[in-house]
Structure formats: structure tokens, C-alpha cells
Amino acid sequence: TFTNDESQHIHDVCGKIPVDQVGAEALGRLILVNPWTRRYFKSFGDLSSAEAIQHNPKVASHGAKVMHSIAEAVKHLDDLKAYYADLSTIHCKKLYVDPANFKLFGGIVSIVTGMHLGTDYTAQKQAAFEKFLHHVEAALATGYH
């Protein structure tokens, strides 16, 4: 659960970030920093270099899609597990994504968010946003239990 202040900080952060851009950058960084994640994106074409990843339209599109899902999840703070139930099942039973990657992605989302918000990404906002991301990660991992 989230306090009123945490909820306000989460809404504030999600309301200020350029969702498409943060998603594209975060997914690109995930793939670049954690090269084993490339196996999940074989259909995306060339992921052979930083340049290729950063300019890959499929990476950008999928990253934006993921971030839109996270931004929409803000409306479901009280029941993230239900909100992500279907997506959790897909990632577990169809895509076979290692749930540890959700945590890696969440950390990168926080970093990229900080890059975009600068000094407006205060320690309090970061703490609330990262708590939210941890809950999203846990909700996505539900299908694995």
C-alpha cells in the first residue's frame, strides 16, 4: 500500500515524464547493459551494437508500450496484481521471461526518469516511484508462483 504522499509523488512523476521517450531509452539501456536480454527480442532485428539498439524502431515502440502500461498502472495502485494478471501470465507461460529482468528494467526506468526530470526528481519522489516500480515488478512476477 501507498501513503497519500507516496501516491501523490507517483502521480506527479508519471504525469511529468515523456512516457514514449523514457520507455524507449529504458528498454534500449536494458538490452545494452544486460546483453542476455536480447534473446527476448530476437524478432526486433539488429541489436548488435549500442547504435543499432538506440536507433531500432521496434525497441523504441516496445519500450513506449511498456511505459504506457506502467503509466496506466498508476490508476490501479490499490490492485496492481489484478491489473497485471494477464500480462504476468503471458510473460511467465508464453514468453518465459526471467522475472529478475522486471527488477532490472525498473531500476533502469528510475535512472532514465531521473535523467529527464532532473532536480524535480527529489529523493522523496524517487523513493515513492521506486516503491511503485517494485510493486509493479512483484505484480508481473505473480504468474511465476
Curated annotation (Swiss-Prot):
Transmembrane segments: none annotated. Belongs to the globin family. Signal peptide: none annotated. GO terms for cellular component: blood microparticle; haptoglobin-hemoglobin complex; hemoglobin complex. It comes from Triturus cristatus (Great crested newt). Keywords: Heme, Iron, Metal-binding, Oxygen transport, Transport. Involved in oxygen transport from the lung to the various peripheral tissues. PROSITE patterns: GLOBIN. One of its GO terms (biological process) is hydrogen peroxide catabolic process. This is Hemoglobin subunit beta-1. Residues 1-145 form the Globin domain. Major hemoglobin is a tetramer of two alpha-1 chains and two beta-1 chains. One of its GO terms (molecular function) is heme binding. It comes from the Eukaryota. Disulfide bonds: none annotated. It holds the Pfam family Globin. Red blood cells. Heme b binds at H62, H91.
